[in-house]
């Protein structure tokens, strides 16, 4: 049977290729980790060629596991780590430098210099982003300034810039396509999300030649055909989205007011604001959720640096648990009369505080505080931080009501206790889907719907399946008291007043 969909999920630490059949069932999976390079303090790099090899390898593993050939694959969808920056020679296809990863902080001083020139409002107005090293623009400027001869080659159109999706499409098509999608473009710091174009003024400020930029397409579009030398046949690449936006799609959050939150090492929450390009007054990011049929849907995005990483800390540094899965059962044993707060600012605090110098702290310890109370505090910190994001979103946009339902995914959502506490603190329902791999599902749907094999948005939304809905059950006075304690704890960790 033909009509299979291949979804490539190129992440920060590993690459996965997943095959779906016509009924949206997973029939094959390949996964491979790759090397993390740390050449200097705060620097993080990937070998783009190693990533490309991991994609080829995982595709072959998935095909073998499914027992099918590449000729049975109708379309390819790609989702990827956002903002990671690659520059390669347009003819040879060889990278000029290792990829600079989104986590890399080498351009912090440059960002500070731009802020001192009072340029952040201009960047935010056009891109919806803040002047931060996370985003691609200052990484690309660094490469142009530090790789000998690169600027001249860029001005002559001899090199290509792209995020990981662009790099993979270029390699998959044998160098024929230099393209990206609107969601990945929206994270570069040089793309005008209101006018859907590369912004000449921002390019000029950062010193980036337009000749090296990819063409920007809808998320479901014709991105090119794979080189038949790779898998024996040409397969159309029909869907692309950055990882967090792909999770919005995979969770079928197609209506304004719908919200998804992904809980992994950190947490990314996105709220669909429809065609409203909301300007945040709470230092949230305004971004493109997806662009389909030429229509741009926007989102407010907030990021939490430490979510599942707090559980890893309990396991690896504190030795309170042996494996992460033990934490929920331990938290359930906590003394309900103790109110312990963990502010996990191990690497600063993200949205809406954006305090890079804040550091973690624990409040409320008594002689009776033990492992169980620490476990509960770690899990509750995720709920409190999500509350901060939702409250900021509600302050920014009238469409974010108290009736918002949160759809969740990621490793932490398997814990019933954590999801119930999340619903209690948010005072909002939390929906956990049957299929938790929503990021790769979103990439698959983009390609499959474009190919006419899977249903359209309405049909896909109807087929989205909920595993469990967690309804808020905490008394309002208890909830208000708990949140007040959290706010007091956070205020003691901040290095600057809010």
Swiss-Prot record:
Q: Does the keyword NAD apply?
A: no
Q: Which InterPro entries match?
A: ATPase_NBD (IPR043129), Carb_kinase_FGGY (IPR000577), Carb_kinase_FGGY_CS (IPR018483), FGGY_C (IPR018485), FGGY_N (IPR018484), Glycerol_kin (IPR005999)
- The residues the record assigns to binding glycerol are 82, 134, 243-244
Q: What class of enzyme is it?
A: transferase
Tell me the domain of life.
Bacteria
Q: Which portions of this protein are annotated as coiled-coil regions? A: none
Q: Which UniProt keywords apply?
A: ATP-binding, Glycerol metabolism, Kinase, Nucleotide-binding, Transferase
> A biological process (GO) annotation for this entry?
glycerol-3-phosphate metabolic process
Catalytic activity, EC: 2.7.1.30
Q: Which catalytic reaction applies to this protein?
A: glycerol + ATP = sn-glycerol 3-phosphate + ADP + H(+)
Give residues annotated as binding ADP.
12, 16, 265, 308, 411
- In the record, which residues are listed under signal peptide? none
Does the record carry Transferase as a key word?
yes
Q: Known SUPFAM superfamilies for this protein?
A: Actin-like ATPase domain (SSF53067)
**Pathway linked to the protein:** Polyol metabolism; glycerol degradation via glycerol kinase pathway; sn-glycerol 3-phosphate from glycerol: step 1/1
Cellular component (GO) terms are: cytosol
Question: Where along this sequence does the record place binding of ATP?
Answer: 12-14, 265, 308, 312, 411
One Gene Ontology molecular-function label:
glycerol kinase activity
According to the UniProt entry, how is activity regulated? Inhibited by fructose 1,6-bisphosphate (FBP).
Q: Which residues bind sn-glycerol 3-phosphate?
A: 12, 82, 134, 243
User: What role is this protein assigned?
Assistant: Key enzyme in the regulation of glycerol uptake and metabolism. Catalyzes the phosphorylation of glycerol to yield sn-glycerol 3-phosphate.
PANTHER family with a match to the protein in the record:
GLYCEROL KINASE, SUGAR KINASE
Family stated for the protein in its record? Belongs to the FGGY kinase family.
State what protein this is by name: Glycerol kinase
Q: Which organism is it from?
A: Brucella suis (strain ATCC 23445 / NCTC 10510)
Origin organism lineage: Bacteria, Pseudomonadati, Pseudomonadota, Alphaproteobacteria, Hyphomicrobiales
């Amino acid at each position: 049977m033909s009509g299979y969909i291949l979804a490539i999920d190129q992440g920060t630490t590993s690459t996965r290729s997943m095959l779906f059949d016509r009924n949206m069932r997973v029939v094959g999976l390949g996964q491979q980790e790759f090397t993390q390079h740390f050449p200097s303090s705060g620097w993080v790099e990937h070998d783009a060629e190693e990533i490309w090899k991991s994609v080829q390898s995982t595709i072959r593993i998935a095909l073998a596991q499914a027992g099918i050939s590449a000729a049975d694959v109708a379309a390819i969808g790609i989702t990827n780590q956002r903002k990671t920056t690659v520059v390669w020679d347009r003819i040879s296809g060889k990278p000029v430098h290792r990829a600079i990863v989104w986590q890399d902080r080498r351009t912090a001083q440059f960002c500070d210099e731009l802020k001192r020139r009072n340029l952040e409002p201009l960047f935010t107005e056009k891109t919806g982003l803040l002047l931060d090293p996370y985003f691609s623009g200052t990484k690309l400027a660094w490469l142009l300034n530090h790789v000998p001869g690169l600027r001249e080659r860029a001005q002559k159109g001899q090199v290509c810039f792209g995020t990981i999706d662009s790099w993979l499409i270029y390699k998959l098509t044998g160098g024929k396509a230099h393209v990206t999608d609107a969601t990945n473009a929206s994270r570069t710091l040089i793309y005008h999300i209101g006018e859907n174009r590369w912004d000449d003024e921002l390019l000029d400020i950062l010193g980036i030649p337009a000749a090296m930029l990819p063409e920007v397409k809808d998320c479901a579009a014709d991105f090119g055909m794979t080189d038949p030398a790779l898998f024996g046949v040409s397969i159309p690449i029909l869907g692309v989205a950055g990882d967090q936006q792909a999770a919005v799609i995979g969770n079928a959050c197609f209506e304004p007011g719908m919200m998804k939150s992904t809980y992994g090492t950190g947490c990314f929450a996105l709220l669909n604001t429809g065609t409203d390009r909301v300007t945040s007054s709470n230092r949230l990011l305004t971004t493109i959720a997806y662009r389909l049929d030429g229509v741009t849907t926007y989102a407010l995005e907030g990021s939490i640096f430490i979510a599942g990483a707090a559980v890893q800390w309990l396991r690896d540094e504190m030795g309170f648990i042996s494996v992460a899965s033990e934490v929920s059962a331990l938290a359930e044993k906590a003394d309900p009369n103790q109110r312990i707060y963990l502010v996990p600012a191990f690497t600063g605090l993200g949205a809406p505080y954006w305090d890079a110098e804040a550091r973690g702290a624990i409040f409320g310890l008594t002689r009776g505080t033990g492992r169980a109370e620490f476990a509960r505090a770690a899990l509750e910190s995720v709920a409190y931080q999500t509350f901060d994001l939702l409250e900021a979103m509600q302050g920014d946009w009238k469409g974010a009501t108290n009736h918002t339902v949160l759809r969740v995914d990621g490793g932490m959502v398997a814990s019933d206790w954590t999801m119930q506490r999340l619903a209690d603190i948010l005072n909002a329902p939390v929906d956990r889907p049957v299929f938790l791999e929503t990021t790769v599902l979103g990439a698959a749907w983009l390609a499959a719907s474009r190919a006419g094999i899977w249903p359209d948005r309405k049909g896909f939304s109807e087929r989205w399946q909920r595993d469990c809905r967690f309804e808020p059950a905490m008394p309002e006075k208890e909830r208000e008291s708990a949140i007040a304690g959290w706010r007091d704890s956070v205020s003691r960790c901040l290095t600057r007043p809010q």
